[in-house]
A protein has these predicted regions:
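Generic anion/oxyanion-binding catalytic loop in active/binding sites
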Residues: 8, 87, 142
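A glycine- and small-aliphatic-rich helix-loop capping segment at beta-alpha/alpha-beta transitions
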Residues: 100-106, 133-134
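Solvent-exposed loop/turn segments at secondary-structure junctions
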Residues: 15-17, 41, 89-92, 119-122, ...
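Short, glycine-/small-residue-rich phosphate/pyrophosphate-handling segment
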Residues: 113-151
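Short beta-strand->loop
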Residues: 12, 87, 115-116
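N-terminal beta1-alpha1-beta2 submodule of the flavodoxin-like/Rossmannoid cofactor-binding fold
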Residues: 1-82, 92-94, 99, 103, ...
Length: 164
């Protein structure tokens, strides 16, 4: 599998730790590098109150031009051809910080494979939205439970069609 996934990065944003756990497991089974997308201004519980239409995440999700700043940077993005991109589903889509990440790099010639965590929502139209933000090829992706069996995760990773 390591030959198949050569030059592969698992990049993720996690608020509660669920996506982090999934990303760590995916990086392990895929023999890929791991990168955490860290917001410049960390999110708080209050920021993520979806019941409050004035919460930070509610405002971001309702503003298609919102691009939360990122504190971390992949120093060697050119070496990666395949990028697993993990995030929680917020308001039925990827958080805006994922769009910031994609727009921060030249993704032309890269294969983007989204994966997400959610208490109830599926990945929805996230791939279509993310495709607008980069020149790479974004596939539909999948939603997982954070404690998915590593063997199932490995099988899913192998089934993706990667750039060589």
């Amino acid at each position: 599998m390591s030959e198949l996934l050569n030059n592969t990065l698992v990049a993720y944003f996690s608020f509660t730790g669920n996506t982090r756990k999934l990303a760590e497991n995916l990086a392990q089974v895929a023999h890929a590098d791991l990168f955490e997308i860290v917001p410049k201004k960390p999110y708080t519980e209050e920021d993520c109150d979806w019941h409050n239409p004035e919460s930070r995440t509610s405002l971001e999700c309702n503003d298609s031009s919102s691009r939360p700043a990122i504190a971390t940077h992949v120093p060697n993005m050119d070496q990666y051809r395949n990028i697993f991109l993990g995030f929680p589903i917020w308001w039925y889509a990827a958080p805006r910080i994922i769009e910031t990440f994609l727009e921060s790099y030249d993704m032309e010639g890269k294969f983007i494979i989204p994966f997400c965590t959610s208490g109830s929502s599926d990945i929805g139209d996230s791939a279509l939205i993310l495709q607008r933000d980069c020149d790479g090829k974004v596939v539909t992706g999948s939603r997982f439970e954070p404690d998915v069996f590593k063997g199932d995760l490995a099988r899913w990773a192998i089934m993706q069609k990667f750039y060589k």
